[in-house]
């Protein structure tokens, strides 16, 4: 990470306070938080972890829509993935931050634990197709290779879970979070 600060005095004060001062976020009962994804996505989980579940959270389809919602006043805070410990920076997010009138006010870490989710009563040996975000498929590749199922990419892990739940086909599964399993009524 890099930060550009104009003068030495400002830089010294920033460094001195960086690890001791945490900015207090202004939260009201009607505070709205926008995140990229759908309920059960890891970005949704980050939003809930940072702001709590009592705040009004809503998802949008694309990263740039988070910045747009903030700039338009449709949301008070936004949550975007910045980096992934196994794959590095999330493509395009830094450009969105630079191109829009938004700033980072905090960070939260979410442990990514992938689960194989199927319709209630489905059996692992019957699974023929697994859906997930490309990164989820990559991170679970050794397991999926042993499973021998066809792998298909979708926009994110929670969308895969939602799709499997709606189709209710015991031969389909999703790689997604435990939270997505809870939200969409799937078995792990």
Predicted ranges, named:
Residues 2, 6-188:
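Domain-level signature for soluble enzymes in the chorismate/prephenate branch of the shikimate pathway
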């Amino acid at each position: 990470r890099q930060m550009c600060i104009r003068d030495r005095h400002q830089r010294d004060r920033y460094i001195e306070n960086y690890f001791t001062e945490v900015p207090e976020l202004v939260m009201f009962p009607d505070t709205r938080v926008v995140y990229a994804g759908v309920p059960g996505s890891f970005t949704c989980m980050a939003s809930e972890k940072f702001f709590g579940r009592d705040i009004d959270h809503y998802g949008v389809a694309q990263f740039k829509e988070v910045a747009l919602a903030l700039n338009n006043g449709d949301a008070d805070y936004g949550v975007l993935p910045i980096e992934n410990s196994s794959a590095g920076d999330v493509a395009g997010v830094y450009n969105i931050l630079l191109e829009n009138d938004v700033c980072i006010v905090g960070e939260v870490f979410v442990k990514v634990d992938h689960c194989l989710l199927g319709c209630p009563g489905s059996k692992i040996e019957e699974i023929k197709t697994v859906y997930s975000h490309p990164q989820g498929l990559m991170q679970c590749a050794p397991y999926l290779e042993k499973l021998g199922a066809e792998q298909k990419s979708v926009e994110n892990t929670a969308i895969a879970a939602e799709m499997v739940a709606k189709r209710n086909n015991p031969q389909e599964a999703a790689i997604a979070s435990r939270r997505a399993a809870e939200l969409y009524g799937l078995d792990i």
